[in-house]
Structures are given as C-alpha cells and as structure tokens.
C-alpha cells in the first residue's frame, strides 16, 4: 500500500512539474524530481512516464522548446498548449491542411474530429505533423478554413 502511495506522489509531482512548462530535457526533469525527494528516479523512468502520459515537446510562452502534457484524456480542448502546436493552416479547393509541431497532428485531429459535422468537419487524416481536413456537406472549404483559424486563434 505504501508503495502505491509513493507512486501516486511521484505521478502528481511529475505532472505538476510538466505543467510549469519550463523543462527542456529529461535530465532537468530527473533533477527536479530528485529535489522533490524522489531519490530513486532516473532518466529511463522519466522517459517511460513521458510516454505513458503522452507528453510532447512544444514551445512555451517564451518560445522555448519544453515538455508539456496535453489536456487530460477525454476530449481535448483548444486551451494552451494545444493551440501552440498548430504552426500553419492553409487550404485548396478540396481540403484544409494543418501543419503542427512534430508528433502533434493526431492530437489536434482528435480535437477536430470531436467537433464533428455540426461544426463543418466531415473528417480528418493525420500523419506525424500534417492533417488533412475535409468539410461536411453544406460547408465550403473556405468556411472550414476560417473556422479552424478562429478555433486555434490564428490570423485570418
């Protein structure tokens, strides 16, 4: 029982540190956790935790590349840092193309898919850093493009 409490404390401390959005390397996270009293933490454990909790590297408000956690599981929202993961949005006659930070496309596509047809999204296809989005019936590609710009607070 004591061991699971220690594990829960480690997870809480780990998540709290990542919410600060100031750690650019795994070794920085290791040292911060050691400072919090977790002496047995090492880089491989931090690496496994980053993977387990879906942490991504993105730019913080100071434009530094840092580790952060996406919104909690469930339907993601567009609150920071997700909107910071969208780098560019463009369109042609058929689709809206969204470029994201590496590794972020599937997370952003999941958000868009959760909005659904009522918001103009028929569906998405996501790679590592690129998303193709097609409009639902009754919506033009340009309308979808403009809605996505507003959603991620990009310039019109």
From Swiss-Prot:
GO CC aspect terms: cytoplasm
Keywords tagged on the record: Amino-acid biosynthesis, Arginine biosynthesis, Cytoplasm, DNA-binding, Repressor, Transcription, Transcription regulation
Segments passing through the bilayer: none
GO molecular function, one term: DNA-binding transcription factor activity
GO biological process: one example: regulation of arginine biosynthetic process
Location of the protein in the cell: Cytoplasm
Functional pathway: Amino-acid biosynthesis; L-arginine biosynthesis [regulation]
Keyword DNA-binding: yes
UniProt entry tagged with the keyword DNA damage: no
Function: Regulates arginine biosynthesis genes.
UniProt family annotation: Belongs to the ArgR family.
HAMAP family named in the record: Arg_repressor
Protein name (database record): Arginine repressor
Provenance organism: Pectobacterium atrosepticum (strain SCRI 1043 / ATCC BAA-672)
């Amino acid at each position: 029982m004591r061991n699971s409490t220690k594990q829960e404390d480690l997870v809480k401390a780990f998540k709290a540190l990542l919410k600060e959005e100031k750690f650019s390397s795994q070794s920085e996270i290791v040292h911060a956790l050691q400072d919090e009293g977790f002496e047995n933490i090492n880089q491989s454990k931090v690496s496994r935790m980053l993977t387990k909790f879906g942490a991504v590297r993105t730019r913080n408000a100071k434009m530094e590349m840092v580790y952060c956690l996406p919104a909690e599981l469930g339907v993601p929202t567009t609150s920071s840092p997700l909107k910071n993961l969208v780098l560019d949005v463009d369109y042609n006659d058929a689709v809206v193309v969204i470029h994201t930070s590496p590794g972020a496309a599937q997370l952003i596509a999941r958000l868009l898919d959760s909005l659904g047809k009522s918001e103009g999204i028929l569906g998405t296809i996501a790679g590592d850093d690129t998303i193709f989005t097609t409009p639902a019936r009754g919506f033009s590609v340009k309308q979808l493009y403009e809605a996505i710009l507003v959603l991620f607070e990009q310039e019109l």
